[in-house]
Amino acid sequence: MKNVGFHQRNELGLKNAYKSKNKIYIDNDKMYLAGTSNLQDVWDDLKIPLNLTRFSQRYQDADNLLKENPQVKKIVGHSLSGAVGLELQKQHPNKDFDITTYGAPVVQVGGQKYKRFRKSGDLISGLDDGAITYEGSMNPLKAHSYTGYN
C-alpha cells in the first residue's frame, strides 16, 4: 500500500483545485488541475480528440501559471486536465514534469510513461490502455471520480 499517501495527497490537491476560481491549485512544486467544471470546459473537451488541447482555457491558464511558478515539477490532473497536463509536457519539452492523471481522455495502447490511473466503468478514460485500472462503479459518474484510489 505504498501509494495510499500518494493518492490521498493528490485527492486533497484536486479538491483545492476544484474549489479555486480558475480550477488550478499550486502547492510548492505541485500543480493540481481540476477537470471539466463549466460550459467552457465542455467546449474545450471537444478539442482533445482534435489535438487542440493547447487552445483550451484550462491549458492557457495553467501555462501562464507555470511561467509565474517555475518551481512546479509535478502536475496532477483529472479528466480534461489530465489531457492538459500531458499537453503541457508536450509543449515544454525542455521540462521533465512528473505527471499524474486520473480519468484522463487519453488514447494509448500499451506502455506508460507517466502515472495514469482510471477506474473500470469510466467511459471518459476507457481508451487509455496505458493507465493503471482500479475497480470502479457501474455508475459512470462515480467511476469517473478522482477519489477512492486507495
Segments from the language model and where they lie:
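Alpha/beta hydrolase fold serine-hydrolase catalytic domain that processes acyl esters and thioesters
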Residues: M1-K74, Q91-N150
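Gly/Ala-rich beta-loop-alpha elbow adjacent to hydrolase catalytic centers
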Residues: V76-S81, G85
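Short Gly/Thr/Asp-enriched flexible loops that form oxyanion-binding sites at enzyme active sites
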Residues: L88
